Curated annotation (Swiss-Prot):
InterPro entries referenced in this protein's UniProt entry, alphabetically: KOW, Rib_uL2_dom2, Ribosomal_uL24, Ribosomal_uL24_CS, Ribosomal_uL24_KOW, Translation_prot_SH3-like_sf
Protein source organism: Thermosipho melanesiensis (strain DSM 12029 / CIP 104789 / BI429)
Annotated protein name in UniProt: Large ribosomal subunit protein uL24
Pfam families in alphabetical order: KOW (PF00467), ribosomal_L24 (PF17136)
Gene that encodes the chain: rplX
GO cellular component, one term: ribonucleoprotein complex
Lineage: Bacteria, Thermotogati, Thermotogota, Thermotogae, Thermotogales
Function: One of two assembly initiator proteins, it binds directly to the 5'-end of the 23S rRNA, where it nucleates assembly of the 50S subunit. One of the proteins that surrounds the polypeptide exit tunnel on the outside of the subunit.
Record-level GO BP terms: translation
Length: 106
């Protein structure tokens, strides 16, 4: 199944503690239907000292958020929108904005 949200997309959070925030998708986790968005859903984790991190402590990192809780921000109209698929004349399947109709994948 084709993914409506991909790595590098700008998304807006629709619900939860970070409602209204926008950020870039860092990672997509298809098996869990989750995405990691930069600057959104920050959680604190207790880190033990190890080879990479000499000093342990409490670190802040982004946690995954469900795909249904975010909406893609259209690059042309700048609004949070649903995504559809259509085939171009050359046979490519591309994503498009359902609000303005512009193709998202170039």
């Amino acid at each position: 199944m084709a993914r409506k949200i991909k790595k590098g997309d700008t998304v807006k959070v629709l619900s939860g503690k970070d409602k209204g925030k926008t950020g870039e998708v860092v990672t997509v986790i298809p098996k869990e239907d989750k995405v990691v968005v930069r600057g959104v859903n920050i959680v604190k984790r207790h880190q033990r000292p190890n080879a990479q991190m000499r000093q342990g402590g409490i670190i802040e990192k982004e946690a995954p958020i469900y795909v249904c809780k975010v909406a893609l921000v259209c690059p042309s109209c700048g609004q949070a929108t649903r995504v559809g698929f259509r085939f171009l004349d050359d046979g490519r399947k591309v994503r498009y904005c359902k609000k303005c109709g512009e193709v998202i994948d170039k």
